[in-house]
């Protein structure tokens, strides 16, 4: 978590209302009109009041209500100055949300694995969570291979982040039965301007962030924000690892007579961020549990990296043309150009119409050196490219040609080209309400449409490196007869995960989803229900290499041939086999629902219950798995694996009041979730790559704020008891074997918490953020547990005058060694391969307001 998160939390809670007063059920239409906000189910730009229970809920909500009067778990990271926050990745920011579990993080560019309420991340990404910007999803699926939803979003200059966990997320968003997280932009209602320049102290990052906006005249207003970042990054690769920008803006025309508004949006994102692949730690093992974790000599996972000056580029083999190319080994590099519009209109009375539209041109690349712990003893004597390995030597660098012994990184060097990940999305909704002798009835409904392209080509090379966290050198293999078996450490081009993972596909998924929401309220009681019908259509094609198109050859001068000498690298390689062509032409339909009831015990306390059912389609992760017929339709096996259903039940209490001269707000909830899944994870060993599993979880969430004078406190905690109810894995869908049940799912912890006190005295503000988690299963299908861990962050800021302030942020103050993950764990004698949290970083910044 970013230490500077406490800045925003402090600003949002430092001036809580002195006392709670009686409040009627919120009038949604008047709230929207007063704020010039969108009236749809997921994206109004409303600046919330400081008390967390009085913040207006607009995310996955058909009607704008304050949190106290909402029958589900909602968190809003307070508005104003999210721009002043300094999280090192989106993953650190999401840890502020109760119920959200961030299993690991791969750097500031995204690719984090995160989920909610004990639902497992079995394949990667965020399969149950939709990330939105201003009420519309960035991409249709949160767990696309090399296209997770956190690739395309940067949060530096959002006005606020709001999350709805469970409940209506199942019905008022696409494929998000777990949660909807919405990054909401400022819209220029108030004149403001701010520029921040930050500099890493001890690590290479310089970043400039700005935001400016305000009224143009009585009916027009605007907001523009953005950033530029440049440097070597948190983990010094020896070359520029961070370089990019985002520019985002909107202009709003308010209609006469408070009839609504018309708004235009634009966004440009071109940002290159380093990728953290993990590394080794020294540890003792006690059965399935790690202990005594410490830094492995030569590779500190807090600062080390698998990328350096000796592998700044990746040589890849086009799996279509068979020609070699060069790509920068530059982590995650997204390009997003978006244009959007919104019309919110109140034609008469209480009737409102809201239509949000956006078209996005999206592409990018993913380049990384993954980590897999191995040793020379297991490599020497093995068969590689048809010959027996006799020696391991340095491929280049200062030790070129010298023999290498000991542990090594035997993993995948991958370059994925995301040719086209663009989409078009539109959400049209209507709402009206009527007051009757029997209470107030609010009816809303609409239709959601989104078309998502997924066009990618993969190039996974098998590559070996020396085990070093600073400028690791590649390792070559030499056979017992003196034949060179690799080129700069690469033993195979496109062959790292087997021929079927050398793939090329171009597919399109559309979702057409009408939805309906009804709310009835009388006196202190509110009943709410919503239903959604999602109809997906998947078309396109996929193809891969095969054993028939996988061979060995001699590599010389960028050409492959059948003959060569001992000093010419003999490598394996694969290209696409046209006979693997798989047409895609099928539909997925399902119905989601959510029902809830809320009762106001008094003006400051509410209780609620809710149940929901939602779905998550599987699209690109199910291709080339034998799930389709020759005409592209789903066969009987594929029909059972194209959709996963999540069931949730929850109950909670929300309360606000006064304590010791200050004001507080607190929420407490209980939840139960259940889920089953059949899918495929290419990063697992071949023997456990396909799986069919069932899960369930019980748990509770707690969130509270308290403020008195210059002191404020934000805290949240989640306890969950997720279990694997059944667990079948195997090398193919027809070869599954049970591995048992009853254990903690991969990547999961039972307890997670955040405690963030802040104090302001005159011109000085300081604070701490303490966050941690209990024991975590960092293994794959076979459990392997890391110990509990916690981190302390701190910050201090000083106002030089009314316009200029300086700040110092320290993340991971004690440089704690924290490990995570949820994938395959590789082990050696006293050594374990893990993903890891970044070590201590210090960031200085200066902010000017104008």
Please annotate each region the language model reported.
Residues 27, 524, 659-683, 690-781, ...:
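Gram-negative outer-membrane beta-barrel transporters
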Residues 90-93, 113-117, 129-132, 148-151, ...:
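N-terminal periplasmic accessory domains that precede
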Residues 421, 440-484, 497-673, 718, ...:
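Structural signature of Gram-negative outer-membrane beta-barrels, strongest in the C-terminal barrel
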